[in-house]
Amino acid sequence: MADRRRQRASQDTEDEESGASGSDSGSPARGGGSCSGSAGGGGSGSLPSQRGGRGGGLHLRRVESGGAKSAEESECESEDGMEGDAVLSDYESAEDSEGEEEYSEEENSKVELKSEANDAADSSAKEKGEEKPESKGTVTGERQSGDGQESTEPVENKVGKKGPKHLDDDEDRKNPAYIPRKGLFFEHDLRGQTQEEEVRPKGRQRKLWKDEGRWEHDKFREDEQAPKSRQELIALYGYDIRSAHNPDDIKPRRIRKPRFGSPPQRDPNWIGDRSSKSHRHQGPGGNLPPRTFINRNAAGTGRMSTSRNYSRSGGFKEGRTSFRPVEVGGQHGARSGETLKHEANYRSRRLEQTPMRDPSPEPDAPLLGSPEKEEVASETPAAVPDITPPAPDRPIEKKSYSRARRTRTKVGDAVKAAEEVPPPSEGLTSAATVPESTPPAAKTGNWEAPVDSTTGGLEQDVAQLNIAEQNWSPGQPSFLQPRELRGMPNHIHMGAGPPPQFNRMEEMGVQSGRAKRYSSQRQRPVPEPPAPPVHISIMEGHYYDPLQFQGPIYTHGDSPAPLPPQGMIVQPEMHLPHPGLHPHQSPAPLPNPGLYPPPVSMSPGQPPPQQLLAPTYFSAPGVMNFGNPSYPYAPGALPPPPPPHLYPNTQAPSQVYGGVTYYNPAQQQVQPKPSPPRRTPQPVSIKPPPSEVVSRGSS
C-alpha cells in the first residue's frame, strides 16, 4: 500500500499541491480521503489524511468550492460505497490506501475534478496562511485544529501522544494487564480502588428510583400510636375489634357460625345462652345452670317437664335438654305434634333452639305442669297447632341437638353417674310418667316421655307406642315420631338429627341394659348408661330404630299403621344389620327411613317384621323386650355383640328381607353411609361409649 502511494506520489504532477490538498482533503475517512488522495496523488499527505476521520474530510470538502466538492464527493463516495469492502477500519491507513489504489485506476477521469478540488483546498489553505509544503506536516494539524477539525490530526500522532501517556497497563484495553472497572461484575473490584472510588461517587449520585413515598402506606406516625376510640374502630372495621370478649358486639358474627352442625351448639349460646351453653355442656352437673331445665326439674310438673327433667336429671337429657329445652317449652305442647315439630323444629331448633329454649323452657317448666301433660295428651290431636309454636323451640332444639349430642357424650358419662340414679330421674319421669301414662297421646307428643319410668315407661312406651302408632299413622305420626323419632325421626328430619340419634341410641342403649331401656330409648334423656349403650342403643336402636324408622316413615307420610311400621321394622332390621356392621351408621337408617318406606311395603309381611314384631315398631319397649329377651345380656353384652347379633339376627329376618328387602336396605344404607360419616364427626365422641358398652357387655 505504501509503495503504491509512493508511486502515485511520484506519478502525480501535483505532488506537493495535491499532497497538501490531499492531506487537507484526506482527513475524510475512507471515501473522502481516498478520493482526494487519489485525485491529488499526494502520497505522504494522503496517508495521514486518510487516517483522519471522515469528519475532517467532510469539513474540508465543505470548505472547498461547491462544484468541485460536490463532484468529488459524488464520485469518491459512490465509488467508496461500491468498493467500501476494501476498507476494514477507519484507523488503518493501509485499507484507505487500498481504496486509493482502486480509485487511482479511475484517477485519470477524476484527476481533473479532483485537481480542481485540490486547488480549492490549497487556496483555502493559503488563505489561512499555511504553506503547501508544510501542509504535509504541522500545517495540517494546526490548520485543521484551527478549522475545528482537530480530529484530522493523524491518528498515529493522537494515539502516540494521548494513549501511551495517559493509559496505564491496567487501563489499556489492548493490554493483557487491563483491569475492567465498569460493569456490574467489576463494581466491587478493589484492585483499582483509587479510580473506583472516583467512579463510585458518580454511581451514588444517580438514583434509579425515588424512595420519598415508599413507606407511606406503612409509615410510623406518632399521632397514630394512641389507642383508637370505639367510634374510630367501628368506623374503620365496622365493629369494635377489641370486643371479642363482648358477646353483644360479636353476636352477629357468631350467629353466622351456627350454620354447621356443631356450631349450632355455639350458636344457641351466642343467641343469648352463653351461660346456658356452659350449663348445657355441664350437662348433668349443669342441671341448675340450664334455667329452663332447672325449672322443669324442679317443676317436674309435666311430661314435657319430665322430659326436660330427664334432660336435667338424666344428664343425658341434660345435653339433650340443652338442645331440647325450648323443645320442652314449646315442644311439650308440640311434642304431641312432635313429628311435625321434629321436621320443622329440627331445622328451626338449631336456629332457635338456644334462644327459644332459654325463654321457652322457663315458662314451659311451669306450663309443663301436669296440665301441660294433659295438654299434651289433648294436644296429640292439637299437636299441629302446638307444633307451630314449638317449631321455633324445636329449632333451638336442633341446635341443642348437636349440642346435646356433644353434651351427651360428656353428659353421657355424667349421666351415667347421674343416671345410675336414672330410676330416680325416671322416678321423676315416673311421677310425670304416671300422669303421662294417663295421656299416652301426651307422651306421644313428648317423645321423651317414654323414658319417664323405666318399667312403667317401657310399658307405657309400648302402650304409648301403640297409641303413638295408632295416633301416629293418623295424625299424631308427628307426635309419636318425635318420641320414636326422637332418636330416629328427629335425626331423619334434621340433617344433624342422625347424629343425635346416636345420642338417643346411647340413651336407649344405656337404658337397654335395663327394662326401662326402651322407654329410655324413646326418652333418651333418662338413659342410665347413655354413652356406653351407644351400640346397644344402636343395636336395640336398630330394632328400636325400626320403630324410629317407622316413625320417620310415618313422618315421611307413611301413615300406614303398625303394618308399615312392621315393614319399617323389617327394614330397620335390614338396616339393623347395617347398623350392626356400622353401629354408628344406625343414624344412617335415619336417612333410610325415607328410603325404607318402599322396603316397608316389601317387608311388612316378612318374618323380620315378625321377629321385630309390629310391637317392635310401635312399642320400642317391645323392641327392647325383644332385644332384651332375644339378647338377655343385650343390655350389657349387647352393645358390642348386639351389632353382630343384630346383624345376623337382622339377617335371619333378613333371610326374608335377604331377597329384595335386604338389598334395598343395603342400597339405602349405602346412601346413609355417606350421611353417617357426616354424623360421625359429631358422634365421634359417642364411638368410645360403644367400646365401653362392649366392655360392659363382656363383663
From Swiss-Prot:
Post-translational modification comment from the UniProt entry: Phosphorylated.
UniProt short sequence motif Nuclear localization signal 2, positions renumbered to this chain: 251-259
Composition skew (Low complexity), residue ranges: 19-28
Region Sufficient to form the EJC: start-end pairs: 134-280
GO biological process: intracellular mRNA localization; mRNA splicing, via spliceosome; mRNA transport; nuclear-transcribed mRNA catabolic process, nonsense-mediated decay; regulation of nuclear-transcribed mRNA catabolic process, nonsense-mediated decay; regulation of translation
Biased composition (Basic and acidic residues): 107-117, 124-135, 155-175, 208-231, 242-252, 338-352, 410-419
UniProt keyword list: ADP-ribosylation, Cell projection, Coiled coil, Cytoplasm, mRNA processing, mRNA splicing, mRNA transport, Nonsense-mediated mRNA decay, Nucleus, Phosphoprotein, RNA-binding, Spliceosome, Stress response, Translation regulation, Transport, Ubl conjugation
Ranges of compositional bias, category Gly residues: 29-45
Any one Gene Ontology cellular component term annotated for this protein: exon-exon junction complex
Residue positions, PTM Phosphothreonine: 354
Compositionally biased region (Acidic residues): 73-83, 92-106
Gene Ontology MF: a single term: identical protein binding
UniProt feature coiled coil, ranges: 93-128
Annotated region (Necessary for localization in cytoplasmic stress granules), positions in chain: 374-699
Tissue: Expressed in the brain, including in the hippocampus (at protein level).
Pfam (any one): Btz
Motif position, Nuclear localization signal 1: 201-207
Free-text note regarding domains: The coiled coil domain may be involved in oligomerization.
Function: Required for pre-mRNA splicing as component of the spliceosome. Core component of the splicing-dependent multiprotein exon junction complex (EJC) deposited at splice junctions on mRNAs. The EJC is a dynamic structure consisting of core proteins and several peripheral nuclear and cytoplasmic associated factors that join the complex only transiently either during EJC assembly or during subsequent mRNA metabolism.
Protein name according to UniProt: Protein CASC3
Name of the encoding gene: Casc3
